[in-house]
């Protein structure tokens, strides 16, 4: 037998079941095919395309549902008696529409592209090194295009005037509107960083607090700014309504400043290494409780004797 034949035989035997049962053939190990959605080192064209599709579909689904609900609330005669959208029923309806829409959209597409659905949120993720700068740009383009598509679709499917565009109300100035948008966006982005980026046992439920934070932002800001906190949402509605007020820039500058503010707070916590101290405090508390429980058990045993 030649040396080549013996080598082939050796290779064949190395792939047999080590237990020797029925000489079962064990196929060679296959390369890992699943990729980390937020791994910066993977910037292949295919990965970017998948992320772009996921962000487009998620953002479109989120904003189309929210736009239509917002249009219904603003056309309802019973809800528009109060000036500038300050009727409680109107506020709650709009807030629920946006909060629940982003919640189920994130749950659907978080496993595809991360489910940012918001350029401001994408910027926070990029600053936190959860996504690469290239991926951030890809997400931005998909989200902005999806926002305009959702606005056009909602406008075409619903009769009457487009009433889901952002505008200042209740005498709110541009400066106040800028800071309201900034802090509203910061709360939303910080919620994302603390519940989705931080490694916790409750990461799978991140969509719930994110939806709640957007709900709260709409209750707080709608009467004053119309609640942008998402440049794709503001631009898509403005294009559909063909209404670009001279202060439209606050829905971009304010939200981007808010995303930077949220990242700054998150980064400060990382510098302080809060997880180490929180873990140590929990361990000390657990140890103290165990000691007290042991002392109680000893006292009970002595009393019985």
Swiss-Prot record:
Residues 296-305 have a biased composition (Polar residues). Residues 286-295 have a biased composition (Basic and acidic residues). The keyword Disulfide bond does not apply. One of its GO terms (biological process) is water transport. PANTHER family: AQUAPORIN TRANSPORTER, MIP17260P. This is Aquaporin-1. GO terms for cellular component: endoplasmic reticulum; endoplasmic reticulum membrane; plasma membrane. PROSITE patterns: MIP. It comes from Saccharomyces cerevisiae (strain ATCC 204508 / S288c). The keyword Transmembrane helix applies. Aquaporins contain two tandem repeats each containing three membrane-spanning domains and a pore-forming loop with the signature motif Asn-Pro-Ala (NPA). It is found in: Endoplasmic reticulum membrane; Cell membrane. InterPro entries: Aquaporin-like, Aquaporin_transptr, MIP, MIP_CS.
């Amino acid at each position: 037998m030649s040396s080549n034949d013996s080598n082939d035989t050796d290779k064949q035997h190395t792939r047999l079941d080590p237990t020797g049962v029925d000489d079962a053939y064990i196929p060679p190990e296959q390369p890992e095919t699943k990729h980390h959605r937020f791994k910066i080192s993977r910037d292949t064209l295919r990965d970017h395309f998948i992320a772009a599709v996921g962000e487009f579909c998620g953002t479109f689904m989120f904003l189309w549902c929210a736009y239509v609900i917002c249009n219904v609330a603003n056309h309802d005669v019973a809800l528009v008696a109060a000036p500038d959208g300050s009727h409680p029923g109107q506020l709650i309806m709009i807030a629920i529409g946006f909060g629940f829409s982003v919640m189920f959209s994130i749950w659907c597409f978080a496993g595809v592209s991360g489910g940012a659905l918001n350029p401001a949120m994408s910027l926070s993720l990029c600053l936190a090194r959860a996504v690469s700068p290239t991926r951030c740009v890809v997400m931005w383009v998909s989200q902005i295009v999806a926002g305009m598509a959702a606005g056009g679709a909602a406008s075409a499917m619903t009769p009457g005037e487009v009433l889901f565009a952002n505008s200042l109300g209740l005498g709110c100035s541009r400066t106040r509107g800028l800071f309201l948008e900034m802090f509203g966006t910061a709360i939303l982005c910080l919620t994302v960083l603390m519940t989705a980026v931080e490694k916790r046992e409750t990461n799978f439920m991140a969509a719930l607090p994110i939806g709640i934070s957007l709900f709260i932002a709409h209750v707080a800001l709608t009467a004053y700014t119309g609640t942008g906190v998402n440049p794709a949402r503001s631009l898509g509605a403005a294009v559909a309504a063909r209404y670009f007020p001279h202060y439209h820039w606050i829905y971009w500058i304010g939200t981007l400043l808010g995303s930077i503010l949220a990242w700054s707070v998150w980064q400060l916590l990382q510098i302080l290494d809060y997880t180490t101290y929180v873990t140590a405090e929990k361990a000390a508390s657990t140890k103290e409780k165990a000691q007290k429980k042991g002392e109680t058990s000893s006292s009970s045993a002595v009393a019985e004797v």
